[in-house]
Design a protein with these regions (language model features):
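...with weaker cross-activation on analogous glycine-rich loops/strands in unrelated enzymes
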Residues: 2-8, 59-132
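Poly-acidic low-complexity segments
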Residues: 19-20, 71, 144
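Amphipathic, soluble alpha/beta structural segments
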Residues: 96-102, 107-111, 150-161, 165-170
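Active-site signature of cysteine proteases
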Residues: 115-160, 167
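Positively charged, low-complexity intrinsically disordered regions
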Residues: 27, 69, 141-142
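N-terminal capping segments
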Residues: 1-62, 155, 163-170
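Aromatic side chains
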Residues: 29, 49-52, 78, 97-100, ...
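Intrinsically disordered, low-complexity segments enriched in small/polar residues
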Residues: 27, 31-32, 41, 76, ...
Length: 170
């Protein structure tokens, strides 16, 4: 199983996890990221959730060069600077940057599970049906392309197979 499928399998297993109490940002992903239990508006965790997934999947080096960030904007800038940013032809495992209103940088991020025409199916941390970018749960969401700014495409191992390795698999 390649890195992107490991991440998606792990993400699927997290669906339904939520912060307690609601609205606190107190969630296991933040606790692991910061090293202690945090709460309050200063600790949004959509990007932290993705950091946690990569770390748990044994692929920490594919997220932000192995470093940490809780900022969607910082991660998008990194992807652009390192040739990992794509706009279109999205694939499962891409990290999708979203903006729901106004102009500017990303407000939210999730991992792409499936493309359905003009809709992307993502798994996201800190979302809900009532609050796109700060909803306090891990959920599978369907996002219209109009919200998508682009994606960070990590350099997954299954995309780096040599011709000899490919022939051996066949």
């Amino acid at each position: 199983m390649g890195s992107s499928e490991k991440l998606l399998t792990l993400a699927r297993g997290e669906i339904g996890n939520r912060e307690m109490p609601a609205g606190s940002n107190r969630v296991k992903y933040n606790t692991e990221y910061y090293g202690w239990e945090v709460s309050g508006r200063a600790y949004p965790w959509c990007c932290v959730f993705l950091w946690w997934l990569f770390r748990r999947a044994g692929a920490a080096g594919l997220f932000f060069g192995g470093a940490r960030t809780a900022s969607c904007s910082t991660l998008m800038d990194y992807a652009k600077r390192n040739g990992l940013f794509v706009e279109g032809n999205y694939r499962p495992g891409d990290l999708i940057f979203m903006r729901f209103s106004g102009s500017g940088g990303p407000q939210h991020i999730g991992i792409l599970e499936e493309v359905r025409g003009n809709t992307l199916v993502t798994i996201e941390g800190n979302t809900s049906a009532d609050n796109d970018a700060a909803g306090g749960q891990v959920q599978r969401r369907e996002r219209p392309l109009r919200y998508v700014l682009g994606a960070y495409r990590p350099d997954y191992e299954e995309e780096n197979v040599t011709q000899q390795q490919f022939d051996a698999m066949m």
